Amino acid sequence: MMVIGSIFFRRRVSPAFVVTLAFLFLVLRSVADDQITKKDGTNITGTILGVSGDQVSVESHASSGGTVKGLYYISDIKSISMATPAEVTKVQAQGVEPAAVIAALEPQVKKFSGLPADWVVQAMAQLAQTYAAQGQADRAVAIYNQIDTLYPGSKYHAQAVAGKAELSFKAGKIDEALAAVQPIVDQANKDIAPSPSDGATYASAFLVYGKVLEAKKKPQQALEAYLTVKTMFYQNPNLVDQADQLAKNLRDHNPGIGIE
């Protein structure tokens, strides 16, 4: 019996077994880590700690077994793969108290704003929308301006445009809001397979578009805009919930309305 146990023990700690375990550990660790690909093709794996100025701070695993921190210029980064923090995900659903949204998103936005990752800009936009809903339009505008400043000439500009258009609509500037979102709506109608981030931006624009159409007494077209968010640009659950509620309210006030 002891011989069998001894053989079993030796097999468990054989070099091949140890190598296999080490390989599995590295695979699992790499899956959990954030990934940065630089424009020169270099890959950095580790944990993104935050943004300071024009650099990203990353904690990586050293070959010695410890960790090492490095700074990388944002301008040198081609792409980033980073899971959305749980603090952000939990407040994306409709119905979360504004105070909870602000408490969850403010630290994340402060820590990661400027990072070229979709979830960061979406969190900034949601934070701005929450401020606007609380009557703090100046803080909302400041965040949208920050998006334009931190991501000049990027795809995220449309997110800021849609956000400012929402504020224009709330201020009663209907035509100004329409003029702002119309180019985004036109682009969305041409985009057959939008990315998740583009889908979220289009959803924001279509929500404003629908509200403008409602204000212009075009309920059928407004309903179509809301349903487009639900069926085509459904990547952000919070925006889908908003579209669903707007469509429901519209139907309640316009019995028998439908899409041709």
Give the residues covered by each predicted segment.
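N-terminal low-complexity, intrinsically disordered tails enriched in Ser/Pro/Gly
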Residues: 199-200, 211
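Helix-start (N-cap) detector for alpha-helical repeat units in TPR-like alpha-solenoids
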Residues: 121, 155-158, 203, 237
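N-terminal secretory signal peptides that target proteins for export/translocation
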Residues: 1-12
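Short acidic/polar micro-motifs centered on Gly/Asp/Asn
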Residues: 129-132, 210-214
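Compositionally biased alpha-helical segments
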Residues: 29-150, 159-175, 179-182, 188-190, ...
